[in-house]
């Protein structure tokens, strides 16, 4: 993947300003509420039987934060994202059996949460760079499935 200077700077800027403890939980809770079939991967997280339960679930929130910190690896290794996520792809494919389309659903929800946080600063150009980054990560995570 070729990155422009603008794309690199934009991705690094977004993640440097991101409140992981807010954005991560908001992203994962949005994902499992909007796409309830994704809840099957989180059955061990306790009560997730209603929107209120999901919103108050500490394990969902914690995992959302973990996911964002996982994206940090991609930000730090933008020139080698495929290899950066090779082991995580294998884990999600072979052990956790996560449908790879769920990575795209999560990235869409992350885009919505980030756009809401950034407001008018989330221009079309910023969105394009952000979604390009997420697309590369999603493709890398789904690589083991092919």
From Swiss-Prot:
One GO cellular component from the entry?
haptoglobin-hemoglobin complex
Superkingdom of origin organism: Eukaryota
Annotated positions binding heme b: 63, 92
Globin domain span: 2-146
Keyword set for this entry? Disulfide bond, Heme, Iron, Metal-binding, Oxygen transport, Transport
Select a single GO molecular function from the record's annotations and give it.
Answer: metal ion binding
One GO biological-process annotation of the entry reads:
hydrogen peroxide catabolic process
Q: Is-annotated flag, keyword Nucleotide-binding?
A: no
Q: Which SUPFAM superfamilies match?
A: Globin-like
Do the record's keywords include Heme? yes
Q: In which tissues is it expressed?
A: Red blood cells.
Membership in a protein family: Belongs to the globin family.
Note on file? Displays a strong alkaline Bohr effect, and at low pH exhibits the reduced ligand affinity and cooperativity that comprise the Root effect.
UniProt subunit comment: Heterotetramer of two alpha chains and two beta chains. Can form polymers.
**What is the documented function of this protein?**
Involved in oxygen transport from gills to the various peripheral tissues.
Q: What is the name attached to this protein's record?
A: Hemoglobin subunit beta
What gene name is given for the protein in this entry?
A: hbb
């Amino acid at each position: 993947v070729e990155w422009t200077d603008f794309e690199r700077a934009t991705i690094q800027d977004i993640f440097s300003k991101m409140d992981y403890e807010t954005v991560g939980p908001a992203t994962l809770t949005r994902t499992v509420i909007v796409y309830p079939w994704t809840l099957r991967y989180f059955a061990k997280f306790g009560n997730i039987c209603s929107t209120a339960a999901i919103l108050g679930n500490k394990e969902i929130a914690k995992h959302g934060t973990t996911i964002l910190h996982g994206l940090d690896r991609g930000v730090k290794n933008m020139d080698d994202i495929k290899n950066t996520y090779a082991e995580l792809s294998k884990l999600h494919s072979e052990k956790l059996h996560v449908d790879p389309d769920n990575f795209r659903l999560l990235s869409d929800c992350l885009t919505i949460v980030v756009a809401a946080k950034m407001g008018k600063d989330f221009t079309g150009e910023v969105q394009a760079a952000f979604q390009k980054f997420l697309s590369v990560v999603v493709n890398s995570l789904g690589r083991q499935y092919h």
